[in-house]
Swiss-Prot record:
It comes from the Bacteria. Transmembrane segments: none annotated. This is Large ribosomal subunit protein bL36. It comes from Serratia proteamaculans (strain 568). GO terms for biological process: translation. One of its GO terms (cellular component) is ribosome. The lineage of its organism: Bacteria, Pseudomonadati, Pseudomonadota, Gammaproteobacteria, Enterobacterales. GO terms for molecular function: structural constituent of ribosome.
Length: 46
């Protein structure tokens, strides 16, 4: 899963990609091609 600052290009990668909001984060999920998964707003690990 990619951590992106902007999901603008991620949601247009595949026709089946959907934008979902869960727990204050925004996810792009794609069931037909899971390599297009992405998330915006994740905390960085230090």
């Amino acid at each position: 899963m990619q951590v992106l600052s902007s999901l603008r290009s991620a949601k247009n990668r595949h026709p089946d990609c959907k934008v979902v909001r869960r727990k204050g984060r925004i996810y792009v999920i794609c069931k037909t091609n899971p390599r297009f998964k992405a998330v915006q707003g994740r905390k960085k690990k230090r």
